[in-house]
Every structure is written in structure tokens, then in C-alpha cells.
Swiss-Prot record:
Name this protein carries in UniProt: U-scoloptoxin(10)-Er1a
Keywords recorded for this protein, A-Z: Disulfide bond, Secreted, Signal, Toxin
Protein source organism: Ethmostigmus rubripes
Compartments reported by the entry: Secreted
Post-translational modification: Contains 3 disulfide bonds.
Species classification: Eukaryota, Metazoa, Ecdysozoa, Arthropoda, Myriapoda
Coiled coil: none
Family named by the database record: Belongs to the scoloptoxin-10 family.
Length: 84
């Protein structure tokens, strides 16, 4: 019984990671981990861009969401943009 449970959990993790790879969804933590590997200057630049993006989105009512990967505001109807 416990082997079946472990197999089921492992299969769930595999499906989850495959889904993340296929859809291209990455979390803020994933982005920061990659930035840390590239060096402190790159990480600082990414954090600065995300902060600028948050500020810009707050200033314009028609833009409410911020895309972490590209430091620009996205229209509300753009599905791949997400809140930061």
C-alpha cells in the first residue's frame, strides 16, 4: 500500500513539472534563483525592473497586471500577465 502511495505521489510530481515546462509558467522564486546563478548585478537589475513595472502599472488604471519576465505593463485582457 505504501509503495503505491509513493508511486502515486512521484507520478504527481512528474506531471506537475512537465506541466510547468510545457506551459512555461515560472514563479517569482524560479526567476530569482536563475538571477542569483547569473550574479548579483543581474539579480539587482531584475528586481529593479520588477519594481519599476509595479510602479508603472499602479500609475495607469487601464494596466493592472505586471509581467515579471518583461518589465512592462500589460493590458487587463492579456492572459499571460500575472500579478506580482
Amino acid at each position: 500500500m505504501s509503495r503505491f502511495c509513493l508511486l502515486f505521489v512521484a507520478f504527481g510530481f512528474v506531471l506537475y513539472f512537465l506541466h510547468m515546462e510545457v506551459t512555461g509558467k515560472r514563479t517569482r522564486e524560479d526567476i530569482l534563483k536563475e538571477a542569483e546563478q547569473k550574479g548579483p548585478e543581474i539579480k539587482a537589475m531584475i528586481l529593479e525592473n520588477v519594481q519599476k513595472c509595479k510602479t508603472n502599472c499602479a500609475l495607469h488604471l487601464k494596466y493592472e497586471k505586471c509581467n515579471e519576465l518583461v518589465p512592462e505593463c500589460c493590458p487587463k485582457e492579456t492572459p499571460k500577465c500575472k500579478s506580482v
